[in-house]
Amino acid sequence: MPHLLHIDSSLAPEGSVSRGVAEAYAESWRKHHPDGTLTHRDLATSPPPHLNWALVSGGQTPPEQRTPEQAEAVKIREEYLEEVESADEYVISVPMYNYAYPSTIKAWLDQVIVMGRTAGGTAGDGVLAGRKVTVITAQGGSYAPGAPKEGWDHQVPYLRHAFEALGADNIEFITVVMTLSKVNPALAAFTDVFEASRTAAEQTARDRAAA
């Protein structure tokens, strides 16, 4: 049966744009896959451990020789790995924080990128090869060509490389821009741009989930 892994990372439990678009994806997916399995992990409410020496050293130590700290770190990583390995489709929502991504997303990727197991280093070589990956991003402004802060987007480029390292060769980014136009007076003129961007993103998400 189809299995969707749904990852959220926004700190906001309500009103989050990235969560909203990801939920539109999940709702459409459930509608079109009534017998499927959906696993949801919220990295904001249950943050993964950041990479630490117990995990790094424990992964290089035979199981019977691991310290209790190493064994626990490896056990936690195994839970994340099994979630990724058992799914065959993924939707990940990622807001932009300070021109990048939440630290919980980096921590999660550090848990699941394991060379020789889930990662081969290039698209088509890794656990995500042949599986549909959809990344929902929300950005307070716009970093498109010609924008005042063109080149400041350190979110999408990194995430694309990270997921390709996991083998992703069917990946789509759905981005909502100008999310701060509702709260920042300096961006108020772009409210219509934001609303149109969000509406388009939600429809794109629904359509991709149904495909």
Curated annotation (Swiss-Prot):
PANTHER family: FMN-DEPENDENT NADH-AZOREDUCTASE 1 (PTHR43741), FMN-DEPENDENT NADH:QUINONE OXIDOREDUCTASE (PTHR43741:SF4). It comes from the Bacteria. Its EC number is 1.6.5.-, 1.7.1.17. This is FMN-dependent NADH:quinone oxidoreductase. The lineage of its organism: Bacteria, Bacillati, Actinomycetota, Actinomycetes, Frankiales. Homodimer. It catalyses: 2 a quinone + NADH + H(+) = 2 a 1,4-benzosemiquinone + NAD(+); N,N-dimethyl-1,4-phenylenediamine + anthranilate + 2 NAD(+) = 2-(4-dimethylaminophenyl)diazenylbenzoate + 2 NADH + 2 H(+). Quinone reductase that provides resistance to thiol-specific stress caused by electrophilic quinones. It is an enzyme of class 1 (oxidoreductase). Its cofactor is FMN. SUPFAM superfamilies: Flavoproteins. FMN binds at residues 10, 16-18. It comes from Parafrankia sp. (strain EAN1pec). One of its GO terms (molecular function) is FMN binding.
